[in-house]
Amino acid sequence: PISELGFVGIGIGAALGGLRPIVEVMTVNFSLLALDQIVNTAAALRHMSSGQFSVPVVVRMATGAGRQLAAQHSHSLENWYAHIPGITVLAPATVADAYGMLRTALTSPDPVIIVEHVAPYNLAAELDSLAPTDISRAALRRNGTDATIIAYGGCVPKALDAAEQLAQAGIECDVIDLRVLRPLDDATMMESVRKTHRVVVVDEA
């Protein structure tokens, strides 16, 4: 049966039993049906047990609009999950990050949510490395001195396109791909803002 509450519950049980399951709930909208399992069990159990138990489950969910997927398949709820203690929230924008982040997530002792924008699903690319990706830092995708554009996931290509158009007008921008929504890499953002003194945030959520 289609039961996101059940899928995530089974994943949590498997994680507690020593496995490292990957649960796919198709779209972020339907993850709301599993919110109790995610918030009250997966995210909280390590802290409730003083570290005696961990829940190394990875939950993948598609997010984002613009693909004619109807109202129940196109929400962007990653900002909700980014406010839940005990969860790491990842948002890959490239094929390499989508692969590498999943590899790294499978080594985490805590639950990881990967919000995957639907726009890049049809992208293909050669991977330079099959190694896990560092999920503790944002990535500077373009260098500039006049403004900082901060984006993540499916908004990163749009931010890069905008930066290219601005460059033609003589405005050079840093483009930061957050990559990790929780915990945020404040240091990378602040370093850029201290240089440019101007910030534009591109965000569907």
Predicted regions and their residues:
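Residues at the C-terminal ends
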Residues: 16, 107, 168, 194-195
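Short, glycine/polar-rich helix-capping loops at beta-to-alpha or helix-loop-helix junctions
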Residues: 73-78, 163, 184-188
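Short helix-loop-beta junction
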Residues: 158-176
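Short beta->alpha junction loops
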Residues: 2, 176-182
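Hydrophobic, well-ordered secondary-structure elements that form the walls
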Residues: 149, 166, 177, 200
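Glycine-rich, anion-gripping cofactor-binding loops and their flanking helix/strand elements
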Residues: 182-205
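A glycine- and small/hydrophobic-rich beta-loop-beta segment
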Residues: 140, 167, 191-192
